[in-house]
Amino acid sequence: MSGVEAEPVVPGNTTYGAVLLALDPSVEEVHSVLVEMDERHVPDSGAQGLFTRLRAEGVLTAVVTARQELPSEFLADVVVAADPPDDDPEGPLSGRPHRHPPSASLRLASRQLEVDPEHVVVVTDSHRLVRTAVTEGFGLVVGLGDADRRGPLLAAGAHFVVDDLEALDLPLAPVSGTAAWGGGSGGDSPWNLTYTSFDARQEGLRESLCTLGNGYMATRGAASEARAGGPHYPGTYLAGVYNRLRTDVDGLTVEDEHLVNAPDWTMLQYRVGNGYWYLPTEENALDYAQDLDVRTGVLTRSLRFRDDVGRTTRVTTRRFVSQDQRHLAGQETVFEAEDWSGTLTVRSMVDADVANRNVREYSSLADHHLGAVTVEDLGPGTVLVDTVTSQSQIHLAVAMRTRVLEESRARRSGSMVPVTPAPRVTGHEMRIGMAAGEAVRVEKIVALTTSRDRAISTPALAAAGALAQAGTFEELLSRHVAAWQALWSAFAVATGTGGQEGLAVNLNTFHVLQSVAAAGPDLDAGVPARGLHGEGYRGHIFWDEMFVYPMLTLRRPEWTRSMLAYRYRRLEEARAAARRAGHAGAMFPWQSGSDGREETPTVLFNPRTGRWIPDNSRLQHHVGLAIAHSVWQYFQSTADTRFLVEEGAELMVEVARFFAGLVVHDPRDDRYDITGVMGPDEFHDGYPGTPGSGLRNNAYTNVMTAWLLTRTLEMIDRLGQDYGGPLWQRLDLRDDELVNWKRIRTRLRVPFLAGGVLAQFEGYGDLPEFSWEKYQERYGRIGRLDLILDAEGLSTNDYRLSKQADVLMLLYLFSDRELRELLEQMGYAFPPEAVQATVAFYRTRSAHGSTLSNVVHSWVESRLDRRGSWSFLTRALSSDLVDAQGDTTREGIHLGAMAGSVDILTRCYTGLEIREDMLWFRPAIPPQVPEVTFSIHYRDQPIQIELTPAALRLYLGPGPALPVRVWVDGEVHELRAGEIRHFPVAVPDA
């Protein structure tokens, strides 16, 4: 960077999420940055280059200017028009409507960017605007000017001054402001997601982000006063509880399987005197605060309201879903009469009149999954609700106990009486005498069970028994918090990056754990792509599990094994699917639910046209490759030979058989082709004019097939006859089959473009480029280009574009070294410059329409552009916090992106791999990350890992553990029990 006054000092450790270029609003001063050239005002001083770079990195940009228009080449997310100051000798620019004074212009730009001022960099050539930006509290103020202007700019308060913006080097990343977080923030705490007002527009998003669960069940963070409707959507979901319904859609009968919305146990309604039943709104909540403590798994909400006769009441609610006893949950509500005396009426209920209505796209589908409801009174304040799903015939039971802490007062006020205020809604009503300044506590404990549970007689008896043995709210809460402490001791990741990034890391970890922590041999459930947080994707299981397993395998490998068992139990259905398609082996479904059949709908709804269009994503057979990859990675981490013999080897062999059966030999060049498939990019399901035909030689599929055949052969050789003999006999594994695999793995075709760039598929290079800027300008969010182009009568099949990473998935799953070895085995060179060219090519051709895309791009960029990697990572970390996909997080979080973003910090930035019975480390920590500290369990041995820009520190806990071999930057070392080893880090300059 040229012309910097001394060494620039960036205040604090803040990462800035937006750059605001504020041009001096006098006519002559404008020309100091925008110089007239060929009748166009072209940005000078590097401004255009800076903005181009920032937009590529996902950093928001804004311009405050007095000019009526900016040049077309000068792209900014926000443009705000400003008036010249009153004392400007040229006078105000006339005929320019909707202009703002300088201070208002800066504030307006910040609001339109939805980034708090403290996270905005202001760059300006005006000493007046420097002074204004400092006064308004903007995080960093950079002066722009030559040597003659440097003094006045610094005197006005600029942190430093430059004369060339293109080389401006700042800690920039897509940091989300308070508004973009749905009104939530972490403040100074990396453990608390806090909201300070009620916002009906954001309530669905908040309900998902404040979901509480334990892997067996999860409950959305909805207001306990509300039933489904308007901004509210209470929902409770139990792992593996699915039901099928049929719907007539445009003359066709469509059958869908959904994760079932279970009875709502949180419902608690109340009123003061004979007033209305209170429901919080933006108008009637005097004070409102909601806090999710991810360290303890407790959701707290406090509000004050004043009724229509002026009585003020404070209501504080705490809620948890037990991490200690997976069938239990609790909710405590404290009522305080601030300025009135009289009767408080409270209804504690279970609402079984629920349906699946969380996803607008499914509004035309049948949605009532629960059948008849049976209610039983179990004693004072205790009720049992029993129901059953209509098709799968899964019985669900909810037993609920409600207590008023000062029970003597409750009895004097009429005690508790059973109440059924609406069909299928039941519970108890309490009339409580209150005095001004007095508080009363109402607690409800619930037990939920299903007929899928082990070691029970009936769900009703099991729920009633669990509730009878349950302690008080405080007793259950104490054990719940202790269970979370144990989980955090294994899964916490410290980065030192500050409140918001730290909160995003912890929140993502929290939601992953809530979705899987009950995994075990008794719970037959997979990894739902949207967690247990909503009804998005119908609650189905996709390949997203591949992004979740690494985080689990290195800490709780038994969870990974249990969830891989979900796939193994459905292997027979996958075999049957392959046979029906005319293939050998096992063809796993793109979307899986209860029994492993293909659940992918054949049509999807385009809200832009109101029409249903074909959905051909069931051609993504690569889900089987992901399953096999997860099996092998689990084995590499655990050396669990028993798992291979009992389940893993069979999964790998049958998937290998399927893909080996897909290949067709081309004698012209002695290569093998795979046709009729889709890669990870869902925007290409065929060629122009032939949607749904599949692709020829998708690079990801072909390379992964070669990898699978190689590793399956290695696994067979490793197990040999001693371990695998009976299995090989049962599978009828023949020598000629293995010989065929050995040949296929070396002769599969991989397409390339000019410059050694891996082609996404054969024929990709023949497609025209896409007009990215045109569509971004027209539509803003273009993650769903498939729907946008369909509405225009076009198709994503026609262009060089992708919804998400496809080819680059290979560099996500494999190091560049391992990928190079694979391609060389197949007869192709892939030198380092080809790796860089491939990454650069696809970097600018993705719509990032999947939350997984930023995860993959962050990982891939970590070796080439560490700042760019951090930029992608911050977007991945905040995908659900900012609802990056546009009003989708209310339908459930994106579990793969949450787990994958945390995994980047641990495995990617440390370069951690498990190969050849060693831990491999190749650190590449970005400059924005002061440190990464975490723990893993490698083959039952606890290892603490700490990485800073200067050193890698490894500590193997004391005990009888054998030494662990570690590879660090080309050298192999032994780490012994109780030993701490330090290794200097040579971080690349990228």
Please provide the spans of the model-predicted regions.
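Helix-terminus loop motifs that line ligand-binding clefts
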Residues: 516-533, 558-629, 635, 642-646, ...
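Non-catalytic C-terminal accessory modules of carbohydrate-active enzymes
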Residues: 254-308, 314, 823-847, 856-990
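C-terminal capping/lid segments that line or modulate ligand- or cofactor-binding pockets
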Residues: 202-237, 548, 599, 690-718, ...
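Acidic/polar, glycine-enriched structural segments that form the non-catalytic walls/loops
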Residues: 180-537, 792-793, 989-990
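Short, acidic loop-to-helix structural element flanking the phosphoryl-transfer center
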Residues: 36-63, 103, 107
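Active-site core of glycosidic bond-cleaving carbohydrate-active enzymes
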Residues: 538-547, 551-570, 710, 714-717, ...
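Conserved Lys-Pro-Asp/Glu-containing loop-to-beta segment of HAD-superfamily phosphomonoesterases
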Residues: 18, 98-128
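Acidic, Mg2+-coordinating phosphoryl-transfer loop and its flanking beta/alpha structural elements
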Residues: 121-160
